[in-house]
Regions:
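The feature captures the beta-strand-to-loop junction immediately N-terminal to the Walker
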Residues: 36-38
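A short, surface-exposed alpha-helical micro-motif characterized by mixed small hydrophobic
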Residues: 203-205
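Conserved ABC ATPase signature
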Residues: 136-140, 144
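ABC ATPase "signature
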Residues: 221-222
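Conserved ABC ATPase "signature" region
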Residues: 113-131, 240-241
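Conserved ABC transporter NBD signature motif
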Residues: 58-68, 74
Length: 246
């Protein structure tokens, strides 16, 4: 598989003095990579740099192009799902308009594609009923809102989805359901994923590789089998122990 995203020598110093130090990793086509670390370790800062919300030094190659220099070249092909779906869904829009906003703006559909059929297919992909299309975000449960956020993201046909702590506010059953949804999307669509999480247990099943970050530096990486069977760093062992995995 080819690399869809390559991060090389990424560095950034914040006003607080916190630093991202020499970040290097790749994500291949169709691969799920999880970035794991405690709160304040730099996970979300990296995701914001990738999507152009923060500037940094180094290289981020997306399909071979340095998007730190040419952020507009992303053109919707990298999408981000946020921790709080409610805050990212326009409360004045019905669910149908929320899902289709990016589709229409970015002219995602081919001429032969019917927008109503496309919308129903997206709903089916994320496990939502068409009855919710005329509802507003405040009328939905937390799990439904998160599925709407996923639907809106998948609808624009991205190559890479960054999911930032999206399970944190959900109950255990809904977490399992959302992970199963991503597993299905992973199998059926050619999308790469970067999961951001403080809980190594939550993303264990769906991940192909894990990146462990501490104090702005990636200290360990490898397949999930390697990380769980032979963790090299004490910090990694601590994360595994905290999650209750044996």
């Amino acid at each position: 598989m080819k690399e869809i995203l390559s991060i090389r020598n990424l560095n950034k110093t914040f006003e607080s003095g916190f630093k991202l130090k020499n970040i290097n990793f790749d994500i291949k086509e169709g691969e799920v990579v999880s970035l794991i670390g405690e709160s304040g370790s730099g996970k979300t800062s990296i995701s914001k740099i990738i999507v152009g919300l923060l500037k940094a030094e180094g290289q981020i190659l997306f399909k071979g192009m340095n998007i730190l220099k040419y952020p507009k070249k992303i053109n919707g092909k990298i999408q981000m799902i946020f921790q709080s779906p409610y805050s990212s869904l326009n409360p004045k829009y019905k669910i149908k308009d929320i899902i289709l906003e990016g589709v229409i703006y970015q002219k995602v559909l081919e001429k032969e594609e019917n927008i109503d059929e496309y919308l129903l297919n997206i709903l089916n992909d994320v496990g939502l009923d068409k009855e919710i299309l005329n509802k507003y975000p405040h009328e939905l449960s937390g799990g439904q809102r998160q599925r709407v956020g996923i639907a809106r993201t998948v609808a624009v046909k991205p190559d890479l989805i960054i999911a930032d702590e999206i399970l944190t506010a959900l109950d255990a059953l809904t977490q399992i359901q959302i992970l199963e949804l991503f597993q299905k999307l992973k199998e059926n669509k050619k999308i790469s994923y970067l999961f951001i999480s403080h809980d190594i247990n939550v993303v264990k099943k769906i991940s192909d590789r894990l990146l462990i970050i501490k104090d702005g530096e990636i200290i360990e990486s490898g397949t999930k089998e390697k990380i769980f069977s032979k963790p090299e760093k004490e910090y990694t062992k601590k994360l595994i122990e905290i999650s209750g995995i044996r």
